[in-house]
Amino acid sequence: MNNLETFFNFTPKKIEIGIFDNQTNNKIYINKLEINFNLNDLDTLTKILNHQLKDLIIEVENKIEQPLEKINLMIENQKTLIIDVSIKKIFDNSEILKSNIEYIIQDLKQQVSKNNPNMKINHILIKEYILNGSRVNKIPIGCVCKDLIIQVQFICLSKDFINCLQNIFRNHQINF
């Protein structure tokens, strides 16, 4: 059963867990705990989750007959910070290399991190590529262009919140 994928979805009103078999796409286990808590009150969150997760993890591990070691964590939090950024790079009729795009995105990531030191970037979404003023539907690697605009969205959460969740799950020997 090493082909299992485990998802935890946290919202202020519930915790949902789903375990799926990657090879067959079958649901192995689905459960929902109705809980009402403030995801921004870290002390209360820690107390509630430590208690609730212990029972849930035991139930899950009994169902899948193996320890739960790694999960995919989805979080719905009102304090999620979404940062939309666009950057224009002049290529002067040069070919776009994969390393060019990686460098541009890494540079944006560093700027977002530097200007938001209390936040952790959880997702980076490339929203759009604009090549010589025209939108393109694929990564423009290998294209020759005058300029390239990349529109990127960074989804961030508080470092304190992420550290709190990591510690809670670490207490149960689970990583995300």
Short names for language-model regions:
Residues 1-14, 18, 22-70, 75-176:
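Nucleotide/phosphate-binding catalytic cleft detector across ATP-hydrolyzing
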